Regions:
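Extended catalytic cores of very large enzyme megasubunits
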Residues: 1-474
Length: 474
């Protein structure tokens, strides 16, 4: 193709020449040639048969490929490329090396991309294995000795690569996931067998069928059809073991609880997660603090604390943290909140959003004067009135200047919230990107399906979306 000398007969003759050389030099089933061996013979065959232009292009191609291989080995700090590294392009490997591959205390990469995807696939499959019909009883009411299982958590190093699922070994952190997963179902009375019996079954290779499940998950990832979230890539099969990307925390109007939330946020950032918080419970700036007879600094000041913590703690040593800061539209400090990010350098680790309820829309659309009441966070009493049209204009202007704030339609979200009664109140916060509404101390586990890889070519040469493959992946 590079020399515009495409010819099927020529290609066949060259192939026969290469095969003849391989055979004459003793290569075969018992002594397979390397890629370099084959490429050397292709090169010499082209020259011997007088195809100098094709040989020149092939030599240049090999040179470029060698440069890419050398750069890949440099990025991965290795002398040999594993199968995934050969297939992934250089930019993909740079991302894996900078974010996801395990490193030692000297910051040296200690695993290959193949090992990364295997450790992730193994941990995901452990969850499936624990729901095997020989282990899991969905109706519950089966008591087990949970303390016996918990004992294994004190001696994890004794079980590093001791068990395997088919051909895939469990490291000590996979084993920890197995123990914790078992404890979770046992506490609900859903474990049919003891943990010791589970290990007996595992040692007897009764769960080898799940090796195919591991391979399936592995192939989805290495074929770049599906990828889990970053914390899963960073932590699955590792010491931290934290797989969730997004959390929501509460922010009560109490100094001790504020500091507890700050501490929890720091731990989440450390493990690679992000946080959404509704700051509306915090009293407005200037309100009296009874315990000190002082005045409150307001919600925005506490957002600055979380912002600083985010700045200082790089997520899992890999990336900056992310926050969603929310304030209800009825909060007395709402104007300051809306305009806070119009200046550069303010709350750079935050997305901010105004939480809007039905009474605001009524004031904006239905009332003649647009009067809207801002209320005390302590007792709900009126603090002052503001024009709803002024607020919506302020939101629009600030969003035009700085792309902040967004709007969260809590009236619509809670219209379809089936958990309000069970959780004792409405949803009032979302994860950092805003796509998942959550209650405090809930998390969401995200993943991505690569739709571009789900197209197929039809008999007439056109392309269409492969709905069947999409359904299988989901």
């Amino acid at each position: 193709l590079a020399t515009s000398e495409g010819d099927r007969d020529l290609a066949q003759n060259l192939t026969n020449g290469v095969l003849g050389k391989l055979s004459s030099q003793g290569f075969g089933t018992e002594n397979p040639p390397s890629v370099e061996d084959i490429q050397d013979m292709v090169e010499s065959t082209l020259i011997e048969q007088g195809h100098s232009e094709i040989a020149k292009s092939y030599i240049l191609y090999r040179h470029e490929r060698r440069k890419i291989r050398d750069e890949k080995m440099k990025v991965l700090n290795t002398k040999v490329l594993d199968p995934v590294s050969k297939e992934f392009d250089l930019n993909c490997l740079r991302v894996l090396a900078s974010r996801y591959l395990f490193r030692n205390n000297k910051n040296e990469i200690t695993e290959s991309p193949t090992q990364l995807f295997e450790r992730v696939a193994v941990l995901i499959t452990i969850g499936d294995l624990l729901h095997d019909s020989s282990i899991f009883n969905p109706t519950g009411n089966t008591p087990q000795n949970i303390e016996e299982a918990q004992e294994y958590l004190t001696k994890l190093d004794q079980f590093n690569y001791k068990f395997k699922i088919d051909e895939y070994y469990l490291n000590q952190y996979h084993f920890r996931g197995l123990v914790n997963g078992y404890i979770d179902i046992a506490q609900k009375g859903q474990a049919k067998i003891s943990f010791k019996d589970l290990l007996t079954k595992l040692a007897a290779k009764e769960f080898t069928d799940y090796g195919a499940r591991i391979t399936e998950y592995y192939n989805l990832m290495v074929n770049q059809v599906f990828l889990p979230n970053s914390p899963t890539m960073m932590n699955a099969g590792g010491r931290l073991g934290q797989l969730s990307a997004c959390f929501v925390l509460g922010m009560p109007d109490d100094m001790g609880k504020i500091m507890k939330t700050t501490s929890d946020a720091a731990l989440i950032f450390k493990s690679g997660g992000g946080v959404g918080i509704n700051y509306s419970e915090l009293r407005e700036e200037g309100d009296i603090v009874a315990s000190t007879s002082g005045v409150a600094s307001g919600p925005v000041s506490f957002m600055n604390i979380i912002n600083t913590v985010t700045d200082v703690i790089k997520q899992g040593g890999k990336r900056r943290g992310a926050n969603m800061g929310i304030m209800d539209v009825s909060h007395p400090d709402i104007e300051k909140f809306i305009t806070n990010k119009t200046e550069p350098g303010v709350l750079e680790n935050f997305n901010v959003s105004v939480g809007v309820w039905g009474d605001f829309w009524s004031a904006l659309v239905d009332s003649e004067d647009g009067a809207y009441t801002l209320r005390s966070t302590r007792d709900g009493s009126p603090v002052r009135e503001i024009n709803a049209h002024h607020l919506i204009d302020l939101i629009a202007t600030s969003a035009w200047k700085s792309a902040e704030p967004g709007l969260i339609f809590f009236d619509i979200i809670n219209k379809y919230n089936v958990f309000a009664k069970a959780r004792g109140g409405p949803l009032r916060a979302t994860n950092p990107c805003g796509e998942q509404s959550l209650y405090p101390y809930e998390s969401c586990n995200l993943g991505s399906i690569n739709l571009a890889n789900l197209t197929k070519r039809t008999a007439d040469g056109q392309y269409e979306f492969d709905w069947q493959k999409y359904e299988e992946i989901v």
